[in-house]
Design a protein with these regions (language model features):
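Substrate-binding pocket helix/loop in short-chain dehydrogenase/reductase
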Residues: 97-98, 105-110, 150, 158, ...
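Active-site helix of classical SDR
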Residues: 121, 165, 173
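Short C-terminal tail/terminal secondary-structure segment
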Residues: 146, 197, 236, 247-261
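A conserved structural motif in NAD(P)-dependent oxidoreductases
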Residues: 220-231, 242
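Conserved glycine-rich cofactor-binding loop
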Residues: 7, 14-16
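The beta1-alpha1 cofactor-binding region of Rossmann-like NAD(H)/NADP(H)-dependent oxidoreductases
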Residues: 39-40, 59-71, 103, 229-230
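Short, small/polar-rich loop/turn modules that mediate ligand/substrate recognition or access, typified
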Residues: 181, 186, 246-248
Length: 261
């Protein structure tokens, strides 16, 4: 097993991409620490992992709170002894017409999609530095490397807060890699393309969701959405010792997007 006896924290892992990552980790021998604000989703994820014979524990944590994160990491280390892996997956998106995007949209999206990534890494790395070992994987997006297609009433500018945050995560990954590398900590990033998740139609007009799916699918060379296990496999590689000489890198898991700019 590639992650035998590892303690792996995955934020936003009660559903969607995060849940698939946590389940993959547990399949490979890790104890998956399910971090989510939705207690029902969190409990369901833990139960599903345990039903497959894996190990998991759930924590309800608001990852936008620096003090809450520090307390959570301290409690986890006190219970489990260490933190080996952190996957910064928690995120939100808000799509509004370009002219309707307001300060509250920027604050909400950057608060979770960027600031929380930094503070999670900061809190976890305190313990990883003591261990002289750790793996941090940040989840960015293909929108961090290119623009979103214009669909219906929503132009590229509708995703400005989300895309900007995800682009910043790629740069933050390099900064953290340089900062933490001397302490034996690898920091890498995965930029997913189009996957069908609960965020697919988030904040979109229901009539535009089908067109959104078509346009995003056509933008990929493989002409299909990604499968959750395909993303989880990429994250698993970066979380395992198979990637021990890789740090500061971003792997695009996007089916070959042709609309990058």
């Amino acid at each position: 097993m590639r992650l035998k006896n590892k303690i792996a924290v995955v934020t936003g892992s009660g559903s969607g991409l995060g849940k698939s990552i946590a389940m993959r980790f547990a399949d490979e021998g890790a104890t998956a620490i399910i971090v989510d604000v939705n207690e029902r989703n969190m409990a369901t994820a833990v139960a599903e992992i345990e039903a497959r014979g894996g190990k998991a524990q759930g924590y309800r944590v608001d990852v936008t709170g620096q003090r809450a994160l520090r307390d959570f990491m301290e409690e986890l280390v006190g219970t489990r002894g260490r933190i080996d892996i952190l996957v910064n997956n928690a995120g939100i998106t808000r799509y509004r017409a370009f002219g309707a995007v307001g300060p509250e949209d920027w604050d909400a999206v950057l608060g979770l999609d960027l600031k929380a990534v930094f503070f999670c890494a900061q809190a976890a790395s305190t313990h990883m530095v003591r261990q002289q070992y750790g793996k941090i994987v940040n989840i960015s997006s293909s929108l961090g490397t290119g623009t979103t297609p214009h669909v219906g009433s929503l132009s590229a500018g509708a995703a400005a807060p989300y895309a900007s945050a995800k682009a910043a995560v790629i740069q933050l990954t390099q900064i953290l890699a340089r900062e933490l590398g001397p302490s034996g900590i690898n920091v890498n990033c995965v930029a997913p393309g189009f996957f069908l998740t609960p965020l697919t139609g988030a904040a979109r007009n229901p009539q535009e969701v089908e067109e959104h799916i078509r346009v995003r699918t056509e933008a990929a060379v493989l002409k299909r959405p990604g499968k959750l296990e395909e993303l989880a496999n990429a994250v698993l590689f970066l979380a395992s010792d198979e990637s021990s000489f890789i740090t500061g890198e971003t792997i695009r898991v996007d089916g070959g997007r042709t609309d990058r700019m």
